[in-house]
Amino acid sequence: MLEVMVRHRLGDFALDANFASDGGLTALFGRSGSGKTSLINAIAGLIRPDHARIVVGDEVLTDTDRHIFVPRHRRRTAYIFQEGRLFPHLTVRQNLLYGRWFTRPLQRRGDFTQVVDMLGIGHLLRRRPALLSGGEKQRVAIGRALLASPRLLLMDEPLASLDEDRKAEILPYIERLRDETRLPIVYVSHSIAEVARLASTLVILSEGRIAAAGPAAEVMTRLDLSPITGRPETGAIIETRIVDHDAAFGLTRLRAAAGELRVPRLELPAGSKVRVRVRARDVMIAVREPTGLSALNVLPGVITEIGPSEGPIAELRLDCRGDALIARLTRQSIATLKLSNGRKVYAVIKSVAFDSRAVGRGSDMAKSADVEAVVAEDLFSGATRRDHQSADPAPAAD
């Protein structure tokens, strides 16, 4: 359990944040200057807030009303920055063990071999940081943090300095960290794609205040948050499970409360949990059950909300048997199809809208049936864009 209440003024900027999380990975999302780093620094004890109460588990780290402020070196919080900040004169092994030297023996948790195996860095132990890629440096930094036996892991935009390939390399390890260690994580990011993939709890900040906080799947589908999250990235996340694979066509069949989805083949075993991200711009709407489509995914649903228009565009929120989806349509399509709250419709999603490159790679993820992944990170690049443009249009859809 993580409980955070912070009120603090930094010059002209006022931070006023209050949220709670049951564990897992809590993502702090917002634009630059929204207060994310100030908030995580308050949790770490790097700043002393004007008024605050911060509790991790059963330990109070800060409570200004009771004059409690645990110094940062006694908080047992590990902090991972944008850059790995490894010691250049030490090997990877020595960097990993550095934090452990300063941890009391009775507080030490985590086995060296298990941490090394989980992060896939066994072959790097004799190297020095200068010979590591950006993704490798961050994996070593995560390992060093874990071996310091923290009660809380803080990650301040750890992927911001990495290119897309290195991000794809390290994301599965953060997923494993979230799922296998049971260590509460606070993760700062301004990337909605990272948040959609990783977050258990999502906290959205805007101008120093919390605009929304709660389970990630619920917060992601709030239409009023599009101006903060960015309309091109607006979408939903759906928890699914792999049913089977279609070797002949290179597809994987997923089952969710909303129905079945077919996506490009995932290298995960049947029964694995998969988190699917569906962007609003990739959802078409039909008022009758469509036939003769190239799109393989058709989900029945009911319109529960029509958001305010922005120029010619508006967004709809659908309830698909308990799963929420968002669709972005023109106001002309909404008028032509006579769409309104309570109207039964069909959401149409092309399989090629789910980019399998955003799924965790290889056996690292396949080892656990509880691994979650995200598809649909870069939906319309390369061949995917060409396929979308050349496909037959869906009848009665925007």
What is each residue range found by the language model?
Residues 59-64, 107-124, 175-176:
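Conserved ABC ATPase "signature" region
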Residues 147-151:
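A short, proline-enriched helix->beta-strand linker immediately N-terminal to the Walker B motif
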Residues 61-78, 102-105, 109:
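ABC ATPase NBD coupling module
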